From Swiss-Prot:
Its main location: membrane. Residues 43-78, 245-264 are extracellular. Residues 108-199, 369-440 are annotated as: Disordered. A connexon is composed of a hexamer of connexins. Interacts with TJP1. Gene3D superfamilies: Gap junction channel protein cysteine-rich domain (1.20.1440.80). It comes from Mus musculus (Mouse). One gap junction consists of a cluster of closely packed pairs of transmembrane channels, the connexons, through which materials of low MW diffuse from one cell to a neighboring cell. May play a role in myelination in central and peripheral nervous systems. Residues 1-21, 100-223, 286-440 are cytoplasmic. It is found in: Cell membrane; Cell junction, Gap junction. Disruption phenotype: Mice display myelination abnormalities characterized by extracellular vacuolation along nerve fibers. Mice lacking both Gja12 and Gjb1 display a more severe demyelination phenotype associated with oligodendrocyte death. These mice develop action tremors, tonic seizures, sporadic convulsions and loss of consciousness preceding death in the sixth week after birth. This is Gap junction gamma-2 protein.
Length: 440
């Protein structure tokens, strides 16, 4: 076998080792050591002379070949090689599916990371869906804002990873446990439940559990089929001689087998290896079933112990829809740009501040009118009369101006007490001259 073939086989075994449980790794070790190596090294040397040393007590040409065909319809070594190939086929197919799925997942994660990266990309107007009846047109929403992030929920399973570079401590522990150690060649033992699942939770997180169980079932079925076929072909013992009566043998002849005891021991060893592989398959299926059941029980206990969760967040259309006078259809949420919502909030604050200033000014004016003393010398009727601006005569204006000036000086009440008659006469004189006069 060339170096390229050995390197390909090594990479293949490493990939199978990385995507299997602990019991699966033991099965792989048994397959490589006790089947491939034992068949290639021991079986080839033991069964190398199985036909050349198979002799019959006759000289009839062709009798030896016919009798050997009756003794071993299929060579032991070739039967075991075919068994190894068929039993390894489900694992190889599972590995191909796992590599393909992980490659697609990594490509999707890379694209999702590029979408999550901040940028200045804008959504084209042509790709926007038409608004429902009664909703504002999307073209009137103003200039498009830069897209900072896009959230995608597609192709995400219950245990899937959140994003690139966001592996939890449990996932990092699983990766270290799957690799089998650190860079210095020492085995890293991860304490806690993260280091005890032996790849089972990693297979669940990658979404490969169903395919893994299916290949286990197919592999176990192949093991049972080859065990039955080996028993029907060879039994449990290689006999030292074989009686043959086929044509062209002239009569019943005795044929003798080379090293029958050694071949019997090797045949029994291969039976044991096949039974061990079948047992490992059954143990692995039981391990997966019990582990999944334990995880389900722990999840229920954790959910019951956690109690009620946090208060759910209100839908995003509660405030913007009420402010804009819109109503959200069923199962829909109204999304409003952050800039428009901020501008609306600032406008509301400005309106509230202006209204507060107006209310304060009105209250101050009312309180000032209530606290000011009434003008002395004027009766209630003249104080309550409405004032007409711009129509008072010069005499009336002077009189009113003098009255206001006198109110501001001390002793104004005594001076006003001596002037009401003169003021009345002046007002009468002004009315005689035909000028409009207003009594204040």
């Amino acid at each position: 076998m060339t170096n390229m073939s050995w390197s390909f086989l090594t990479r293949l075994l490493e990939e199978i080792h990385n995507h299997s449980t602990f019991v699966g790794k033991v099965w792989l070790t048994v397959l490589v050591v006790f089947r491939i190596v034992l068949t290639a090294v021991g079986g080839e040397s033991i069964y190398s002379d199985e036909q050349s040393k198979f002799t019959c007590n006759t000289r009839q040409p062709g009798c030896d070949n016919v009798c050997y065909d009756a003794f071993a319809p299929l060579s032991h070594v070739r039967f075991w090689v075919f068994q190894i190939v068929v039993i390894s086929t489900p694992s190889v197919m599972y590995l191909g599916y796992a590599v393909h799925r992980l490659a697609r997942a990594s490509e999707q994660e890379r694209r999702r990371a590029l979408r999550r990266r901040p940028g200045t990309r804008r959504l084209p107007r042509a790709q926007l869906p038409p608004p429902p009846p009664g909703w504002p047109d999307t073209t009137d929403l103003g200039e498009a804002e830069p897209i900072l992030a896009l959230e995608e929920d597609e192709d995400e399973e219950p245990g899937a990873p959140e994003g690139p570079g966001e592996d939890t401590e449990e996932e990092r522990a699983e990766d270290v446990a799957a690799k089998g150690g650190g860079g210095d060649g020492k085995t890293v033992v991860t304490p806690g439940p993260a280091g005890q699942h032996d790849g089972r939770r990693r297979i669940q997180r990658e979404g490969l559990m169903r395919v893994y169980v299916a290949q286990l079932v197919v592999r176990a079925a192949f093991e049972v089929a080859f065990l039955v076929g080996q028993y029907l072909l060879y039994g449990f013992e290689v006999p030292p001689f074989f009686a043959c009566s086929r044509q062209p043998c002239p009569h019943v002849v005795d044929c003798f087998v080379s090293r029958p005891t050694e071949k019997t021991v090797f045949l029994l060893v291969m039976y044991v290896v096949s039974c061990l592989c079948l047992l490992l398959n059954l143990c692995e299926m039981a391990h997966l079933g019990l582990g999944s059941a334990q995880d389900a029980v722990r999840g229920r206990r954790g959910a019951s112990a956690a109690g009620p969760g946090p208060t759910p967040r209100p839908p995003p259309c509660a405030f913007p829809a009420a402010a804009a006078g819109l109503a959200c259809p069923p199962d829909y949420s109204l999304v409003v740009r952050a800039a428009e919502r901020a501008r609306a909030h600032d406008q509301n604050l400005a309106n509230l501040a202006l209204q507060a200033l107006r209310d304060g000014a009105a209250v101050a004016a009312v309180s000032a009118d209530r606290d000011s003393p009434p003008c002395a010398g004027l009766n209630a009727t003249s104080r309550g009369a409405p004032r007409v601006g711009g129509l008072a005569s010069g005499t009336g204006s002077a009189t009113s101006g003098g009255t206001v000036g006198e109110q501001s000086r001390p002793g104004a009440q005594e001076q006003l007490a001596t002037k009401p008659r003169a003021g009345s006469e002046k007002g009468s004189t002004g009315s005689r001259d035909g000028k409009a006069t207003v009594w204040i």
